[in-house]
Structures are given as structure tokens and as C-alpha cells.
Regions:
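Cleavable N-terminal signal peptides of Sec/SRP-targeted secreted and luminal proteins
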Residues: 3-22
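Metal-dependent phosphoesterase/phosphodiesterase active-site architecture
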Residues: 18-107, 166-239, 243, 296-449
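Active-site environment of divalent metal-dependent phosphoester hydrolases
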Residues: 50-52, 113-116, 147-158, 214-216, ...
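Long, well-ordered early-domain segments
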Residues: 84-149
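Metal-dependent catalytic neighborhoods of phosphoester/phosphodiester hydrolases
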Residues: 109-134, 154-171, 259-264, 299-305
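Active-site-proximal segments of metal-dependent phosphoesterases and phosphodiesterases across multiple
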Residues: 215-230, 238-291
């Protein structure tokens, strides 16, 4: 499978800050506001580092820096470290006090830090997930939350098994307040489940364990259907189709190619193709897909075999700001709010929020800000696959002209890699609209010399 990449990473920023170059500025407001709007939050990749602390020895600020000098550690973290608890608490406190009413929250995995395997254990991983779960439950006692397991939510990392395990049992017990008995049962068995939304009885969440398909997972090598999840998924989607339900798919590791590669799928290619086939077959049932893992803000459009767009997929940016020493750039912490039509669960919009980490550390307070509203910034009708596909075609025209490359060169310094992706000539079931630079912030990307 080839993935057509038609959107420049960060082009949106260029629209907003380089208006002198003659590109259109999106008008404010949606063209056709719906009579009612439902909302839900998406948080991902919390990556709590319990060892984080301020010390004069910057090599010892956090275990997740792996001995590297933390660059500018403050109360809300550092770009070479995973999240201190104060950062995670500030994210959830912002959600709680934002004034936005939401029907539910999706939480797509990865609670433990990025540290070498010997520095963790099964009990430590469970303790971190417990900490994050109880934090969410204490702040949102009446909100239904739908978690998905990440590749770091296990020890050793990535090695999630095809049978029940201590971690699967632990999270099943922790997440009982949010799930029914059938969901708990499948969660114990294979780390996945489906569950109706209490406030929206015709909407079902399917939480997949895509870590079973992740390349580094040696537990699933040479298995055609690890934990029988494919069979279960098809059966669940078929039941939803018969019962006239709509489904949101959530998972940690996304389908499709990685945002920084034109040839590497995030999961093993066989499993990727199998999931794509299932998603195409039930595209009339699936109303949206939501992932984490890459820490990058990305959008993909799934097309059917005739090339028509049939599904919208969203990869959310992370709460953790961590990067490796070799990386030049990283993300500010982010959370997002999706809007949907409660009549048919079609996705209408996404509001992306971020925390300027440098500013928060300097001021000693966290002020989360609206980064962008997708439909207003891009001047599209909604988040339906047809709208996103039309947007991608506009960027493909810009891509063929080379205009956007010059825009990025004019608007950014310290760009050491091409922030554009050539369109693939091969037939493509998925169109990747990837945007890894936050588009509206005066500090859109933390950058390093």
C-alpha cells in the first residue's frame, strides 16, 4: 500500500504568518452551523516520569533524558524529559475548567515514561497507569472515559501478549467504572473492547489493541490474527451495522505510514492491509478513527477501492513534550476537543489546545491556549472525508507548483529537513494530511540550534 502525502507539515502556519505571500486567509465561523453539537475530549501519550525533579545537575532531572542534560527544566517539564505530574495535572485541570461540556473522553494510551527496560517492571507500569486512571477519575467522576492501551503500557514495552496477563487484568479492574462486563471480559482476554456511550446510546466505541500488530512486538510474529482481534472486530462491526449503530475506532498505534516516512507503516504491513480491508468494508458504520503514538498532529483519509474518500482518521499530538537529543524539534503539550453531530455522529470540527512550555516554566503557571479550529483555519465545511479529501487536493495543487516550499523557507529558519512530501504515484487507499507544526501559536514549534 502506498500513502499519498499531499499536505506540507506546517503549511497552515505559513498561511497565518505569511499572508503577504498572497495565500488565502480563512474566514471566521462555520458556514452552516448544525442545530446541536456534541463534544468529546481526546488526550494521548501522557508519559508520566515520576523521577522528574529540579536539580542543579541537569543530567539527573529525569530518567527519561537517559543521562542527557535537560535543556531548561521547569515546574512543567523539559523537552528532554517526559511529563512531570504537574504538567499532566495542568492538562486535566484545563479540561475541567475550560467551560466546554463534553459527553465523554477518549484516552489513547502510553502512560509510563520512555526509559530503558531495566528501569521499569510490570508493577511499576501498573502503578503508573493506576496513577493516571485515579487522577482522571477524581477530576471527572461523572465523565465516561474510553482508554486504549499503548505500546509503553506494558513491560517489557511493546510486548503486549495475545492472552490474558497481569497488566490486562489490572487495567480491567481499574477501568470498571467506565465499562460494562462484556467490555471488561474482552479487555482481560486481549487488551481490547467495545462499549456503548452512555449519553449516546447509538454510538459505540471500539478500542483496539493495535500494539499486537506493532513491529517490535515479537509475541505476535507469524500470527495471522493475534488474540483473534480481527475476527472479533468484524463481528462487532457487523453487529453494529445490523443494530444501526455508529462506531468510533480508537487505538494507540495508527494505521497508515508513519508521518516521517513514505515507506514504513506504523504497524506490520500485513496487519495494516487487513485493518484497511475491514475499515473499508464497514466504512458506513465507522464515523471516525482516533490514534496517538507518533506525538504528531496528523490527519488521514481512507478511500475505497474506487478512490472515493470514505473515512477520516486523526492522530493527536502528545501531552508529553519529550524529544531525543538528536531531534531538532518537538511538540508543545497538547489536548483536543472534537465536535460531532449527535444525530448521526458525523465529525464536525476539532479544537486543538496547547501549552507553551517555555512560557509556563518562566511564569510558573500553565495557561493553555486555543491553537486552531480546523474548519475555520482551513475554510472547510466539516471533518467528513469528502471535505478533508477536497482540502488535500488543494494542497496537492500547491505541492505541484512548489509554492509552499518557498513559503516555509521564508517563514522559518533552522529547517534542516524537507517539510514536504512528494505525492506517491502508486494507487493509494489512504491520503495522509500530516501537520506536525502547531499552526496558530506564536511559538509554533520548540526549536533547537
Amino acid at each position: 500500500m502506498a500513502l499519498l502525502r499531499a499536505l506540507v507539515c506546517g503549511l497552515l502556519t505559513a498561511w497565518l504568518y505569511c499572508s503577504g505571500l498572497g495565500l488565502p486567509v480563512a474566514p471566521a465561523g462555520r458556514r452552516n452551523p448544525p442545530p446541536a453539537v456534541g463534544q468529546f475530549w481526546h488526550v494521548t501519550d501522557l508519559h508520566l516520569d515520576p523521577t522528574y525533579h529540579i536539580t542543579d545537575d541537569h543530567t539527573k532531572v529525569c530518567a527519561s533524558s537517559k543521562g542527557a542534560n535537560a535543556s531548561n527544566p521547569g515546574p512543567f517539564g523539559d523537552v528532554l524529559c517526559d511529563s512531570p505530574y504537574q504538567l499532566i495535572l495542568s492538562a486535566f485541570d484545563f479540561i475541567k475548567t475550560s467551560g466546554q461540556e463534553a459527553s465523554f473522553m477518549i484516552w489513547t494510551g502510553d502512560s509510563p515514561p520512555h526509559v530503558p527496560v531495566p528501569e521499569l517492571s510490570t508493577d511499576t507500569v501498573i502503578n503508573v497507569i493506576t496513577n493516571m486512571t485515579t487522577t482522571i477519575q477524581s477530576l471527572f467522576p461523572n465523565l465516561q472515559v474510553f482508554p486504549a492501551l499503548g505500546n509503553h503500557d506494558y513491560w517489557p514495552q511493546d510486548q503486549l501478549p495475545v492472552v490474558t496477563s497481569k497488566v490486562y487484568n489490572a487495567v480491567a479492574n481499574l477501568w470498571k467504572p467506565w465499562l460494562d462486563e462484556e467490555a471488561i471480559s474482552t479487555l482481560r482476554r486481549g487488551g481490547f473492547y467495545s462499549q456503548k456511550v452512555t449519553t449516546n446510546p447509538n454510538l459505540r466505541i471500539i478500542s483496539l489493541n493495535t500494539n499486537l500488530y506493532y513491529g517490535p512486538n515479537i509475541k505476535t510474529l507469524n500470527k495471522t490474527d493475534p488474540a483473534n482481534q480481527f475476527e472479533w472486530l468484524e463481528s462487532t462491526l457487523n453487529s453494529s451495522q445490523q443494530n444501526k449503530e455508529k462506531v468510533y475506532i480508537i487505538a494507540h498505534v495508527p494505521v497508515g505510514y508513519l508521518p516521517y516516512s513514505k515507506s514504513i507503516t506504523a504497524i506490520r504491513e500485513y496487519y495494516n492491509e487487513k485493518l484497511i480491508d475491514i475499515f473499508r468494508k464497514y466504512s458506513d458504520v465507522i464515523a471516525g478513527q482516533f490514534y496517538g503514538h507518533t506525538h504528531r498532529d496528523s490527519i488521514m483519509v481512507l478511500s475505497d477501492k474506487k478512490g472515493s474518500p470514505v473515512n477520516s482518521l486523526f492522530v493527536a499530538p502528545a501531552v508529553t513534550p519529550v524529544k531525543s537529543v538528536s531531534e531538532k524539534q518537538t511538540n508543545n503539550p497538547g489536548v483536543r476537543l472534537f465536535q460531532y453531530d449527535p444525530r448521526d455522529y458525523k465529525l464536525l470540527d476539532v479544537l486543538q489546545y496547547y501549552l507553551n512550555l517555555t512560557e509556563a516554566n518562566l511564569k510558573g503557571e500553565s495557561i493553555w491556549k486555543l491553537e486552531y479550529i480546523l474548519t475555520q483555519t482551513y475554510d472547510i465545511e466539516d471533518l467528513q472525508p469528502e471535505s478533508l479529501y477536497g482540502l488535500a487536493k488543494q494542497f496537492a495543487i500547491l505541492d505541484s507548483s512548489g509554492v509552499h516550499v518557498q513559503i516555509l523557507q521564508d517563514c522559518y529558519i533552522d529547517i534542516h529537513m524537507p517539510w514536504w512530501f512528494a505525492a506517491s504515484i502508486a494507487p493509494s487507499p489512504m491520503l495522509d494530511i500530516s501537520n506536525s507544526i502547531p499552526p496558530q501559536s506564536p511559538y509554533p514549534l520548540l526549536s533547537f540550534p
